[in-house]
A protein has these predicted regions:
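An acidic, low-aromatic, low-complexity terminal/linker signal
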Residues: 1-221, 225-237, 242-245, 251-260, ...
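Acidic-histidine catalytic/liganding microenvironments
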Residues: 268
Length: 319
């Protein structure tokens, strides 16, 4: 029988090969067509799945916050996921998905959980390409690129969490992120993140740091941009390092994940000296160890501007 750590290690190895596991679930009938669509969340973000426990309602809470549940002594907020997406569960909310990401623990109530599927990231289309809503990061083609493949909507749980349980963050100013950074003339920080809320926070942070940046939405887009910049630099008689000071990348992204992007950069003689910082809500020792194995220079959790600024200074030796 495999241990929990063995399962984690196996999933971590998947990530290094541009693969991941998606937990599929249903929320009830969709508001548009009444169909019971499939939704998904990366298994790495799921701590456990439980039969719905007792919920204690909270006074004056957000309408989508059902209350809190006592899970083995830990008080965890419970979000009504069908209500967030406008779905109508016909069989009630029977399952609780307890999740952990971005250094917080929260649970999502759903109608039912279906299965775990193993996919490659290139089976996931970015939200913009599929005209999905603001709470969707991508559409997963569960059976590959065949005509009648099943589809699952990959939720932007970070955005959902911030909508339902907004956290007050300190204003992103020079006092927070430190003095302005000076990059070599003509160079920028290249960012890759599929989450709209994460991109907006990163943009605010980098603006406060006073550094120019290039924003991309997937690892594939970032990789293509790096190669394009390399060609431009070559034509100008310069190195790509004079154009890209740091690559700041998420881990979970449609088409190509951050692990694969990092490995491609570090295995290419033209790019391997460019510092790569993994910036992800998938915090934890296992992920941080795997980051080191693919050659990333640093790892920092999302929505921590002080730490992000300090990490960028460190990899650029600006301290």
């Amino acid at each position: 029988m495999r241990t929990a750590q063995q399962e984690i290690d196996e999933r971590t190895k998947l990530a290094g090969n541009n693969k991941f596991e998606l937990l599929l679930f249903r929320l009830g009938e969709s508001p548009g067509n009444g169909q019971r669509e499939l939704f998904g969340i990366n298994v790495f973000k799921v701590r456990e799945v439980l039969v719905m426990p007792a919920i204690t309602e909270l006074a004056n809470a957000h309408s989508h916050l059902m209350g809190v549940a006592n899970i083995r002594g830990q008080i965890i907020p419970v979000i009504n996921l069908p209500a967030v997406l406008g779905c109508q569960p016909k069989n009630g909310l029977t399952i609780l998905m307890v999740t952990e990401f971005g250094r917080t623990v929260q649970a999502f109530a759903v109608e039912d959980v279906r299965e775990i599927v193993r996919l490659e990231w290139d089976q996931v289309l970015p939200a913009e390409a599929s005209h999905a809503g603001a709470l969707i990061t991508g559409i997963a083609r569960l059976d590959g690129a065949i005509a009648n493949t099943r589809l699952a909507q990959v939720l932007d749980v970070e955005q959902i969490l911030r909508n339902v349980m907004p956290v007050s963050h300190e204003e992103l100013t020079r006092e927070v992120v430190g003095p302005a950074m000076t990059l070599p003339p003509g160079s920028s920080i290249l960012v890759a993140d599929d989450s709209a809320v994460a991109r907006s926070v990163i943009e605010l942070g980098l603006n406060a740091m006073g550094v120019p940046f290039i924003m991309t939405k997937t690892g594939k887009e970032a990789w293509e941009r790096i190669q394009h910049i390399a060609e431009e630099a070559k034509a100008e008689g310069q190195t790509v390092q004079s154009k890209i000071a740091v690559v700041l990348t998420d881990l979970e992204m449609p088409e190509m994940d951050g692990f694969t992007l990092t490995r491609l950069i570090k295995q290419d003689a033209r790019f391997k000296s460019i510092p790569v910082v993994i910036h992800s809500s998938l915090t934890g020792t296992t992920n941080e160890n795997h980051v080191k194995s693919v050659g990333a220079d640093a790892y920092v959790g999302k929505f921590a501007p002080r730490e992000l600024a300090a990490t960028i200074r460190k990899v650029l030796a600006l301290d």
